[in-house]
Amino acid sequence: MEDSRLLITLILVFGVIFLKKFFQSNQHPSAQRLSATGVNAHGRPQGSTQNALRRTGRVNGGHPVTTQMVETVQNLAPNLHPEQIRYSLENTGSVEETVERYLRGDEFSFPPGFEPSRAPMGANAAVDNNAAGGGEFNDPRKKNMICAENLLDKFHVDLNEDMSNLSFKDLDIEERKRLLVWQARKNLETKLQSDKDLQSLLT
């Protein structure tokens, strides 16, 4: 009799655990954190946050924006001014769309009548602004990272040295780099001798 009661109790306990697991939300942890802050997975306010926004309303008629929405975007785009983020969120109504715009490299404008040079900024934005010398904000995605580099100097390749008899498989990584640069330069020299159009471009 006691064995059957124990068996029924165990079945009930495992049944409850199984049902809990089965009906548990299979959201990603970041989506669960967003729902806890009052923003849904699409970046729109929900629950008590949405009710509070409905009560307060927006003066300019745009989408309602919470400070959590602005902070979420600011964490991903620290070089944007909070007013740029707020204005974009008022237009799109979604954190997700605003972040996608940022990742695409779209321009973020300030609200009409807003003076960016007089606005309070975070420490990072102030440093960037001072470095730029004024009201322009630096965008690290728009820096030109391409610069001409002389590979002969970089890998210490001597063109007078004859490397044609070296075996590629026997060399270490640095020597292979030197050999590849040397071969590319020699191939260019031979091509320049035969191709008059290419020669005219370089002279």
From Swiss-Prot:
CUE domain sequence ranges: 65-107
Keywords: Endoplasmic reticulum, Membrane, Transmembrane, Transmembrane helix, Ubl conjugation pathway
Regions of this protein lying in the Lumenal compartment: 1-6
Spans traversing the lipid bilayer: 7-23
Listed GO CC annotations: CUE1-UBC7 ubiquitin-conjugating enzyme complex; Doa10p ubiquitin ligase complex; endoplasmic reticulum; endoplasmic reticulum membrane; Hrd1p ubiquitin ligase ERAD-L complex; mitochondrion
A GO term for molecular function: ubiquitin binding
Topological domain spans for side Cytoplasmic: 24-203
The keyword Endoplasmic reticulum is annotated on this UniProt entry: yes
Main location: endoplasmic reticulum
Alphabetical GO biological process terms: ERAD pathway; establishment of protein localization to endoplasmic reticulum membrane
Region annotation Disordered: where it falls in the sequence: 36-61
Subcellular location as annotated: Endoplasmic reticulum membrane
Topology with respect to the bilayer: Single-pass membrane protein
Endoplasmic reticulum is among the record's keywords: yes
Function: Component of the endoplasmic reticulum-associated protein degradation (ERAD) pathway. Recruits the soluble ubiquitin-conjugating enzyme UBC7 to the cytoplasmic face of the endoplasmic reticulum membrane where it functions in degradation of misfolded or regulated proteins localized in the endoplasmic reticulum (ER) lumen or membrane via the ubiquitin-proteasome system.
Misc. remarks from the entry: Present with 589 molecules/cell in log phase SD medium.
Quaternary structure annotation from Swiss-Prot or TrEMBL: Forms a heterodimer with UBC7. Interacts with SSM4/DOA10 and UBX2/SEL1.
Family, similarity comment: Belongs to the CUE1 family.
The name this protein goes by in its record: Coupling of ubiquitin conjugation to ER degradation protein 1
Organism of origin: Saccharomyces cerevisiae (strain ATCC 204508 / S288c) (Baker's yeast)
